[in-house]
Design a protein with these regions (language model features):
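Cysteine-centered iron-sulfur cluster-binding motifs in ferredoxin-type domains/subunits
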Residues: 185-205, 213
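Short, charged alpha-helical interaction segments and adjacent helix-coil junctions
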Residues: 176-187
Length: 213
């Protein structure tokens, strides 16, 4: 059995999830970033193909949509998706399933995983204790997800309640084009410890670590 998990990550949550899923599968899989890979991808038909990505403003991030639309040989006997979110998956996986169908792809199953939020204006990830509980819960969920993948279970995609679909899907549509410019007012202060993880994992290499003068 061959397989590939494609991930898109902004701060590392989705990469962590992709790696944890891979660890729990019964057969080894490749883990590749979605960024730039469509230009060099020469993939034979996989038994399993996975898409792991964060939820952006209650929907699918533009780079993930672009990846699905621009990768004609993105195939697999079993294609699954995992939407990593801070607590509100909304209609994200339904949206992905629809876009995939429009591009001749069938989503076999779709799961959501709650992780610490990285949206600072709304409070960020919370305390270490809170984050640890989320990680422990996520690992349990990942084991269940991996079991479903190993057995190639066909499942309906997971989604939020109806009110999220109505309210948040509307917000997603209104703000989708604004996302690329939303980082222009980001800054760091003395709380930054200079670990460099953000610069290392940024998919667009938009963060530069500069020594203090």
């Amino acid at each position: 059995m061959s397989g590939t998990i494609f991930y898109y990550t902004g701060t590392g949550n989705s990469l962590w999830a992709a790696r944890k899923i891979a660890e729990n599968l019964k057969n080894p899989v490749s883990i590749l970033s979605m960024i730039g890979v469509e230009e060099k991808l020469d993939m034979a038909r996989n038994d399993i193909t996975g898409l792991v990505f964060p939820v952006y403003i209650w929907g699918v991030p533009a780079p993930v949509l672009n990846f699905v639309k621009s990768t004609p040989n993105l195939k697999g006997d079993y294609i699954f998706a995992v939407a990593v979110n801070g607590g509100q998956v909304s209609n994200t996986l339904v949206q992905l399933k629809t876009v995939m169908a429009m591009n001749g792809l069938k989503l076999s199953s779709g799961f959501e995983i709650k992780m610490p939020s990285n949206y600072i204006p709304w409070g960020g990830p919370g305390t270490k204790e809170h984050c640890q509980k989320l990680y422990e819960s996520a690992e349990k969920k990942i084991k269940n997800i991996a079991s479903a993948i190993n057995n190639k279970e066909m499942r309906d995609v997971e989604k939020g309640p109806l009110w999220q679909k109505i309210v948040f899907s509307a917000i997603y549509k209104m703000t989708f084009s604004m996302v690329p410019g939303m980082d222009k007012n980001f800054w760091v202060n003395e709380k930054c410890n200079g670990c460099g993880i953000c610069a290392k994992e940024c998919p667009r290499k938009a963060i530069l670590m500069v020594p203090e003068a």
